[in-house]
A protein has these predicted regions:
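S-adenosyl-L-methionine
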Residues: 1-57, 68, 72, 90-141
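Conserved glycine-centered beta->alpha loop in an early N-terminal alpha/beta scaffold
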Residues: 60
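Conserved SAM/SAH-binding loop
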Residues: 63
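Conserved SAM-binding motif I beta-strand of class I
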Residues: 77-82
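Conserved short alpha-helix immediately C-terminal to the canonical SAM/SAH-binding motif I
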Residues: 86-87
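A short SAM/SAH-binding and catalytic strip from SAM-dependent methyltransferases
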Residues: 144-157
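A short glycine-rich, Lys/Arg-flanked "PGG" loop and its adjoining helix->strand segment in the class I
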Residues: 162-173
């Protein structure tokens, strides 16, 4: 399979993605470096055909480097999930800067402010952290590919397992 961009082109583009000004250590906001993001995404596309024309979720999207990269490699739709409203704003800005949020742009981008570690219950309770009712069951089995750089539990001993659980709920082939 061939990717829309060569690995070096993807990495160069991802170097333009704005990162956290002040990462929140308690949320384990360690950035995914452009080189790592490019290698991971390029491998997903060239080895598995997992991005071009696909619907992709980015769990713990942070500033959106994986979401931007997925769109650059041809993802039809990308939905980023994060607990931090500032990260969501930065991710939106990054997606806007690359022209992925325009109505004229082919494809779709969205960002969901939520705590993925609480989503196992909120899938059924329909409660969202941003003060509106959200039906998370609509995401069940929707995504072709799920990408993430989750918290690994170095500050709070929780997160990774719940991120993986959410992957099994929202992914088509989990």
């Amino acid at each position: 399979m061939t990717a829309r961009l060569k690995l070096r082109q993807l990495e160069t583009a991802l170097n333009e993605v704005e990162v956290f000004e002040t990462p929140k250590v308690l949320l384990e906001q360690y950035p995914t470096r452009p080189h790592i993001a490019a290698c991971v995404l390029h491998t997903i596309e060239t080895s598995y055909g997992g991005l071009d024309g696909r619907i992709v979720a980015d769990l713990g999207c942070g500033t959106g480097v994986l979401a931007v990269g997925a769109r650059l490699l041809g993802a039809r739709a990308v939905v980023g999930f994060d607990i931090d409203p500032e990260a969501i704003e930065t991710a939106k800005s990054n997606l806007d800067d690359f022209g992925f949020c325009n109505e004229d742009t082919e494809g779709f981008c969205d960002l969901v402010l939520c705590d993925v570690t609480q989503t196992y219950t909120t899938l059924f309770d329909k409660e969202c952290e941003i003060g509106r009712t959200e039906d998370y069951s609509r995401f069940s089995g929707v995504f072709d590919t799920v990408v993430m750089n989750p918290p690994f539990g170095t500050k709070h001993n929780r997160g990774l397992g719940l991120f993986l659980l959410f992957c099994t709920i929202i992914g088509k082939n989990s």
